[in-house]
């Protein structure tokens, strides 16, 4: 009997990848494994940029998690513990330490950006003991207990599933917070003391016990694994599934999980947080564009909880951080050769980069950025074509308000307020206050405008159904603005004068009250909001092509559009014909570059008006003479 050869056990593929400033286990080419966020964090570390240290659990673990009935694969715990030990060494802090506690964020990261669709937990690692240690070491108990109440609320929502029953109900944690702020005359936590925040922690924990029947978890490692499981679980939540369906993203990709040492923008006047773009994501203009908040955490900006300040004012508020940020954003755009969306936090004057990714943009911006980057010799014309989603060009055809109708609305005093022009075009629709109502009424053929205090990822289907989105909170980088730009929806965000009452289904502004079903109009060019309906007319691109409007043909937007089409004509190897059933359709097709008619369905012509009667007579004719007489 031949002797059997011994075989070695197949080594388990690496599943956890660490990173810190100047060194990383990964790079930007590993998005399939590390997700977009993890790959770009690693890349920024390799560039030597100031990034908080952390580690990424790969997308393969997400796949294994679902394949094994939502259980973590064997050996993962040991890998995470090794990465956690490395993170402790990098920060000089201890996870669960009662002297110098390490806190972490736990964030999702698919290989393509899915803004707000999956879950995040900040300030993880806090409990009664570590919060006291953080208060002592920072010398700032108010900051420590502010972070603690944020953590309990976020963990309660994301991991423990404590949420409003519907979009028309309020978050139970927010109800308690708002009642306290009303009693203290505070807004956005600014008038609350350390004792107030400590009281909120106790109240939030009571909500957790009441809703779950269990106490809030005190063990940081239990918290960590709960958050990791929740982030993997969020890959299959309703809003993520809907977003993937809308954007043709395969469900098999999965998400990575990024565990990163916390840096704090809520330490006081020398701290802050923001989101910015290396170019204007609405227009494509080459200018550093974004928003920030002083004494805040990142979710305050993205979730639209407070209306932030324009990024340019950071130069006066924190000049040293501004100068460094300006240099970094320019370097990142050069490195990636595309417009970048960045997130940052300033902790006691020191800048940290938390994320960079290719920025979502409107069709207007996509065309302008592509054309200008070719002129700047950063990309080729072929690369420019590949960067423009053909569907996004439809946004360039979005209507604008008829000037005379708009002037009449202003003259009649129908202008209600002005917010931030966060999404392109102009639209009128009937007011709805919930995403579900937007879906139902749009399905019935109505044009609706979704009006919310702020949108959340759960509103994704309603946003898709609406012709426009209006929020009273949030800025140009809020969830509403980001998603609206990507969808090409008209959006006005941060219209702070609006007083929205979900229960009464009414919005009050400047002495007027608009009810559900009333008409409202949004001007995406400047952020104006009007009562009633306003007529629209073709966009400058449509006017230039279809109406031979000379002024429109001189517009920068049309010139960029024409340049893209010229490059496309030069690159293509196919001739383009159109399907058209009517003479006016042929005219439109030829104006947009069609070289002929590919298919003409004559039955559509014959079915119009009174043409159907002679056609029937012709078909039923029994002789040539009758047929000729019918025609």
Regions found by a protein language model. Name each.
Residues 503-511:
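Aromatic/His-enriched, Gly/Pro-containing loop or helix-boundary segments
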Residues 435-438, 455-457, 477, 507-508, ...:
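A generic local structural motif
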Residues 492-503:
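Solvent-exposed beta-strand/loop surfaces of large extracellular or lumenal domains
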Residues 244-249, 385-441, 446-448, 528-572:
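Long, charged amphipathic helices and adjacent flexible linkers at domain junctions
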Residues 2-410, 442, 446-449, 456-461, ...:
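Nucleotide/phosphate-binding sheet-loop regions of phosphoryl- and nucleotidyl-transfer enzymes
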Residues 488-490:
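Structural loop-to-beta junction motif characteristic of Rossmann-like glycosyltransferase folds
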């Amino acid at each position: 009997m031949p002797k059997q050869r011994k075989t070695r056990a197949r080594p388990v593929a690496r599943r956890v990848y660490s990173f810190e400033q100047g060194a990383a286990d990964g790079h930007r080419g590993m998005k399939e494994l590390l997700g977009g966020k993890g790959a770009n964090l690693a890349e920024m570390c390799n560039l030597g940029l100031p990034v908080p240290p952390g580690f990424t659990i790969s997308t393969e673990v997400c796949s294994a998690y679902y394949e094994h009935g939502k259980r973590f694969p064997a050996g993962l715990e040991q890998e995470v513990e090794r990465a956690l030990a490395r993170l402790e060494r990098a920060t000089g802090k201890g996870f669960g330490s009662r002297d110098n506690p390490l806190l972490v964020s736990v964030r999702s990261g698919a290989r393509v950006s899915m803004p707000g669709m999956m879950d995040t937990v900040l300030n993880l690692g806090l409990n009664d003991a570590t919060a006291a240690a953080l208060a002592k070491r920072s010398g700032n108990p108010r900051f420590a207990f502010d972070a603690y109440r944020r953590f309990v609320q976020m963990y309660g929502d994301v991991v423990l599933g404590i949420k409003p029953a519907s979009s028309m109900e309020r978050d139970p944690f927010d109800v308690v917070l708002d009642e306290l702020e009303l009693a203290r005359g505070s807004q956005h936590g600014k008038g609350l003391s350390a004792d107030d925040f400590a009281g909120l922690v106790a109240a939030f924990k009571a909500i957790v016990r009441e809703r779950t029947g269990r106490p809030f978890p005190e063990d940081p490692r239990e918290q960590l694994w709960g958050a990791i499981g929740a982030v993997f679980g969020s890959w299959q939540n309703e809003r993520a599934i809907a977003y993937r369906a809308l954007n043709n993203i395969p469900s098999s990709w999965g998400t990575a999980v990024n565990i990163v040492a916390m840096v704090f923008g809520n330490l006081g006047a020398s701290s802050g947080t923001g989101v910015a773009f290396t170019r204007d994501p609405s227009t494509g203009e080459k200018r550093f564009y974004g928003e920030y908040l002083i004494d805040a955490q990142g979710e305050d900006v993205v979730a639209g909880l407070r209306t932030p300040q324009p990024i340019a004012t950071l130069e006066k508020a924190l000049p040293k951080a501004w100068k460094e940020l300006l240099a970094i954003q320019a370097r990142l755009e050069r490195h990636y050769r595309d417009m970048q969306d960045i997130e940052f936090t300033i902790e006691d004057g020191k800048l940290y980069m938390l994320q960079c990714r290719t920025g979502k943009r409107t069709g207007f911006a996509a065309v302008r950025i592509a054309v200008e980057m070719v002129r700047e010799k950063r990309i080729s014309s072929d690369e420019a074509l590949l960067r423009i989603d053909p569907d996004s060009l439809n946004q360039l055809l979005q209507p604008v308000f008829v000037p005379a109708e708009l002037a009449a609305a202003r003259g009649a005093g129908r202008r209600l307020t002005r917010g931030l022009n966060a999404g392109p075009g102009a639209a009128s629709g009937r007011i709805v206050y919930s995403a579900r109502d937007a879906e139902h009424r749009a399905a019935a053929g109505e044009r609706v405008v979704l009006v919310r205090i702020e949108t959340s990822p759960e509103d994704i289907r309603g946003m898709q159904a609406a012709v426009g989105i209006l929020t009273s909170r949030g800025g140009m980088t809020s969830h509403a603005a980001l998603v609206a730009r990507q969808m090409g929806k008209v959006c006005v965000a941060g219209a702070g004068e609006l007083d929205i009452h979900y229960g009464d289904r009414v919005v009050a502004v400047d002495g007027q009250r608009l009810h559900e079903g009333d008409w409202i109009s949004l001007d995406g060019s400047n952020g104006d909001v009007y009562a009633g309906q306003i007529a629209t007319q073709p966009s400058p691109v449509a006017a230039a092509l279809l109406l031979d409007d000379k002024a429109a043909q001189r517009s920068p937007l049309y010139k960029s559009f024409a340049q893209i089409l010229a490059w496309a004509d030069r690159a293509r190897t196919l001739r383009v014909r159109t399907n058209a059933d009517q003479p006016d359709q042929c005219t439109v097709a030829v104006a947009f570059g069609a070289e002929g008619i590919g298919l003409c369905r004559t039955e559509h012509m014959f079915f119009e008006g009174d043409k159907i009667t002679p056609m029937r007579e012709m078909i039923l004719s029994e002789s040539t003479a009758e047929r000729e007489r019918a025609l």
